[in-house]
């Protein structure tokens, strides 16, 4: 019951955030925003089991809103890098992109899955819809 209350409280918070007039204005990505929202989503969606990205880059990306890039070294250890755009048309788009990439990290690092847009990926769709966010490709 405690977790349910926590989720409902977070939903109320998300509703407030998404209904602010400033949410429809361009959002400039910053490390504080990424880390703060990462912690919120990690607690609500992943029970704080999702590790942090090894590195976070704010950069221009062609043909994508964000991406998780991984490199494998000789030790077979993978490094996961989150790449986000410097500017998004709206804050909602930033939030949806961040949680989208977090799901990919969850697939690859926790579930040892491919990280594709598959059944595991789309299993988060209802949770995000409940919070007022969309999960898309």
Where are these regions (language model features)?
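Walker B catalytic acidic pair
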Residues: 101
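Active-site-proximal or metal-binding-adjacent scaffold patches in catalytic folds
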Residues: 1-96, 105-137
